[in-house]
Each structure stands twice: as C-alpha cells, then as structure tokens.
C-alpha cells in the first residue's frame, strides 16, 4: 500500500479576492501555498510544493493558479525551470458522448502546467500546456503579468518542479544591472545566494566584471515562504481556475538518477 501524508489547506478561490504579496528581493515560495494570490517582486525561486525534490505532489483534482507581477512598471517576467516533472500514471477517462477526435495535445488527458499572459482580467494562454519529464524552455511575458495554473487529473498524479522567476526590462537599464545579453535585472538579483541565472546568460553570477561575484555564497534555507519578507494587501483578481479545498498528498520522489516512471510502475504493481 502506498504511504502518503495528507495536509488540508484553507479553502481559496483562485485569484479571486486574493491577497497580493509584494517583495523587494529574492526569496522562495511554494505554488501550493500561493493558490489564488498575486505575487510581486524582483525575483522568486518557486517550487511546486514545500517537499519538492523529496516527495511528489500527488493531490488529485487540483486547480491552482498564481499571478506573478513584475517589480516595476515597464518590467516583464521571465520564468525558467531548474527541474520539471508533471504527469499522471493513468490519464483521465474520456468524456461520455463525445464524437470529436482526440486532442493533439499530449497533456490533455492528464496533469499539466499552463502559463498565461496578463492582464489578470483577460488571461491568454502562453504556449501549450506543459507535462512530462523534460525541462521546458524558458518563457517570458510581453507585459508585467505572468500567470501559472497547475491542474492535476487522472489517477495518481505526480508533480514536482522548481522554477526561477525574474523581473526584467529591455532598453535603458537605469539603476538595474545590465546583462551581457542586453536584459536589465534588479541589482538585488546579482550574485544571489541561490546562484539563479536571472540574466539567462549567467552574467549576473559571473566572477568577472560587471557582476564580480566573490566566491560561493552561503545557500539559505529553501523551506521558508514569502510571509516573512512581504507586505499583504487585498486585491480582487479574476480566476485562472476554481477549486474547493486543496489537499497536499506526499509520496517520496525518486532518487537522483532513477526514472520516476519506472519507480511508479513498480510501486503500482506492488499494491495490486
């Protein structure tokens, strides 16, 4: 029998009557804890859930949305993954009485992550739904808002990802740091202790000029949330999705170097 731990979170309406979190420097947060909220700041290390890289997020029927807002007017948002795993062992069954052909999107039957362009009042899908085990290419918004929506469907969903959020601008940098590729990022993100590639070309973490990062920095704990360094204000935000109570179920993630699909197949066989 599969062992799991369940934690019930307070009920939230996704991005509706949500709290806006404002940050001024780099921090960590968990998507599962920010459902229905709008986060604003310089940079963010975003995990799927608090136990990322140790346990899967396996809550079925999850519909969790988050808006990320750039730090300043004229900025955009860039998101790149460090690690990505989103799928379901068994896809959701097809709807009854449907005569239309199966969708070409391979994520359609199961769990997926979808990005959106803003504004929140009129979200537009940005790219195709993402699923599988391969790290997707980075995405960037054309305006100050980038939305994320995690949907789990089917039998035994498996979710675990870590991504880097960066507020950036193009053109004159002003007080921002100019990357070698021409992007401008907040100076607070240069030589950050997580080693995040906020520029996208590594120049904000280089030991050479203009970053001049001096040796490795102590890596802070990644178990914190945004609560300690943010101010909250209530803002009405339209929903990317809707859900009732959100449950987090945890199962141990596969060890490094092992194929999680093989591990799940073995686990599934042992329970039947």
From Swiss-Prot:
Location in the cell: Membrane
Topology feature Cytoplasmic, residues: 251-272
Disulfide bonds: 173-184, 179-199, 191-213
Signal peptide stretch: 1-25
One cellular component term from this protein's GO annotations in UniProt: membrane
Family: Belongs to the LDLR family.
Annotated protein name in UniProt: Low-density lipoprotein receptor class A domain-containing protein 2
Gene name of this polypeptide: LDLRAD2
